């Protein structure tokens, strides 16, 4: 599907300014063609796409469950191998390497390019850890992309700590600002980003969108 990746607004302006008005006047938008190509679906395809979503959800849910994770014993590498085993059992493949990231209370959080870094394969998952999985499958030309988080409860706990629940509410507030209020037709990506970040600032929430 590489042929469907078009120009962003900034790239368009760069080409127009670099090549000049004469060349810009010959530019023809392929947006309608690309959109029609991507939007065209046969009725018989839809059950398969629904199945792809269900398979992705089932694999990730099991990978984050006690079926796979034994706190104090299971490593990041073990979970990754379990993901690949479940892919094989389901007869599907992934379109990128599944990543796991781990946040640990009172522990130094490694970052990469400003984001939480992928955890080493040897990292042992412990009670109190927050585990993040980035995972997706490819099936009949359709790619899923799941990002899920789980909290490994400590002995005696029956629910996630209040602080983690507050963090989830903040994340939901960011989602609402981005998808319900700022992300409207006719706006550039930069405008949506700036508006969303400004809204988060007024709510006292430190946020980032990528």
Role assignments for model-derived ranges:
Residues 1-210:
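Active-site neighborhoods and metal-handling regions in enzymes and metal-associated proteins
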């Amino acid at each position: 599907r590489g042929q469907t990746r078009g120009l962003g607004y900034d790239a368009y302006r760069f080409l127009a300014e670099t090549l000049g008005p004469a060349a810009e006047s010959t530019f023809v938008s392929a947006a309608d063609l690309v959109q029609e190509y991507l939007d065209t679906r046969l009725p018989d395809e839809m059950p398969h796409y629904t199945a792809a979503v269900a398979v992705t959800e089932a694999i990730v849910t099991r990978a984050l469950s006690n079926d796979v994770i034994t706190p104090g014993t299971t490593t990041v590498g073990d979970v990754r191998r379990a993901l690949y085993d479940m892919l094989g059992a389901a007869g599907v493949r992934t379109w990128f390497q599944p990543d796991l990231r781990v946040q640990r209370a009172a522990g130094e959080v490694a970052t990469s390019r400003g984001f939480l870094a992928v955890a080493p394969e040897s990292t042992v998952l412990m009670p109190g850890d927050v585990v993040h999985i980035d995972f997706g499958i490819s099936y009949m030309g359709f790619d899923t992309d799941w990002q899920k988080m789980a909290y490994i409860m400590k002995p005696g706990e029956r629910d996630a700590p209040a602080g983690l629940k507050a963090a989830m509410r903040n994340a939901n507030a960011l989602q609402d600002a981005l998808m319900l209020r700022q992300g409207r037709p006719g706006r550039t990506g930069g405008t949506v980003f700036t508006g969303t970040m400004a809204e988060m600032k007024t709510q006292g929430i430190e946020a980032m969108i990528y």
